[in-house]
Every structure is written in C-alpha cells, then in structure tokens.
Amino acid sequence: MKKILFFIPAALYYALIFYLSSRSYDIKIDILFFDKVIHIVEFALLGLFLSFGYFMSLKSSLMMRAVLTIFTGIILGGLDEFHQYFIPRRSIEFFDVIADAVGVLSGFLLYYYFSRSVKGKIFTEKLSKL
C-alpha cells in the first residue's frame, strides 16, 4: 500500500494535464513548434513523477523501470490525445504523442541522472525509510 503513495504526484499531475487539455482555447500562438515544446515540457515533468513512482516502488532492473515509465507515459499521452477528440476546437495529433514520448523519456533520464548523484541518493534513501 505504501508503494502506491509514490505515484500520487504523477496521478495529480496527470489530472492537471487532463483538465487543461479539456479546455477549448481560442488563443493561437504563432511560434513554430511551440505546441510541441509545451508537450515535451509537460510530459517531461510527468516522466519525472512516473520515474519517481517506479524507482521508489520497484526493485526491478533499470531497464524494466525505464520500459514501465516510458510505456505508461506514452499510454497516458495517447489517452490525453484521444479525449481531445471530444473537445470542441481540439483535435488528435499523432506528433503530439511523439512529443509526449520524447518528454517522458527526457523526464526519465533527468530522474535517473539525479538519482545517481550524491544528493539524489541521500534524497532517495530518506524517502525509502518513510
């Protein structure tokens, strides 16, 4: 049961993503690939939170935790895009899912490198004792 608590940040953050993507926007920003950059950044944060959950709750191999983090992030990105089909003035874009996957991978790598640092090891050790 305690291990599920490590996924609360990811669940809350995904709820925020879902809420924000449920809104119809009339504002268009005419910067090339701006929306893809936003997808990468928001899903990099999700990747950080998912990585935190998997690293803290599983003692499996690095590869397994990487696959689970990236697979979960891609599924969540796909679900987010699918639900936008039902929102006025929103649409499904395949390249948004690609940007989401790049973001999740980036978030995983950031978490992995942080967790290998001295500060990251101390942080992880303190949390695992809770």
Predicted regions and their residues:
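Bulky hydrophobic segments
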Residues: 1-88, 94-97, 101-130
